[in-house]
Curated annotation (Swiss-Prot):
Record-level Gene Ontology MF annotations: serine-type endopeptidase inhibitor activity
Keyword Acetylation: yes
Chain positions found as N-acetylserine: S1
Domain of life: Eukaryota
The keyword ATP-binding is annotated on this UniProt entry: no
Pfam families in the record: Inhibitor_I66
Protein name as catalogued: Serine protease inhibitor
Function: Serine protease inhibitor. Active against beta-trypsin and alpha-chymotrypsin with dissociation constants of 0.35 nM and 40 nM respectively. Inhibits factor XIa, but not other enzymes involved in coagulation and fibrinolysis. Does not inhibit subtilisin, lysyl endopeptidase, arginyl endopeptidase or papain.
pH profile of the protein: Inactive at pH 2.0, activity is restored after 10 minutes incubation at pH 8.0.
Alphabetic keyword roster: Acetylation, Protease inhibitor, Serine protease inhibitor
Family matches, as InterPro entries: Inhibitor_I66
Length: 142
């Protein structure tokens, strides 16, 4: 399991984060897939909370709102407690990220688009396999 700390989250070569340029409103901010770039601001703080995790990006906890993933600037008590499950068949730092309803994070088809929240596809093997757009690399920063 992951410990509380600072991490990067990737899907393949792309980075998962809030957009670098956002409007100034307090509305929830989209969590998107970004092309590889300067990673300094794109750090996640992952907080362990029992068997679940709160995923914070640039100071804001994340939640699923309908079928997408957002960072909450206000009403942060509505943050989703995520389940993060290792999928070692996909590599050392490979995980799927799920909500309590069993749906999970799915990367969009191209950079700049928002992380999708939907039912995950599980390959009928033991251990199970997942499409690569459902597998996220979570890398601890020292």
């Amino acid at each position: 399991s992951l410990e509380t700390g600072r991490y990067l989250i990737h899907n393949g070569n792309n980075i998962v984060s809030r957009n670098l340029a956002e409007d100034r409103s307090l509305n929830p901010k989209r969590i998107v897939l970004l092309e590889p770039t300067d990673k300094i601001q794109l750090t996640w703080i992952i907080e362990k909370s029992g068997d679940e995790y709160i995923l914070n990006n640039r100071g804001a906890p994340t939640a699923h709102i309908e079928d997408h993933v957002f960072a909450l600037l206000i009403h942060q008590e509505g943050a989703t407690k995520w389940s993060i499950e290792a999928v070692p068949r996909h590599g050392r730092n490979a995980y799927i990220i799920k909500g309590s309803d069993g749906k999970g994070w799915v990367a969009p088809d191209k950079a700049g688009e928002q992380i999708i929240y939907r039912t995950l596809i599980v390959g009928p093997s033991e251990p199970p396999t997942f499409p690569l757009n459902q597998v996220f690399q979570i890398i601890k920063l020292e």
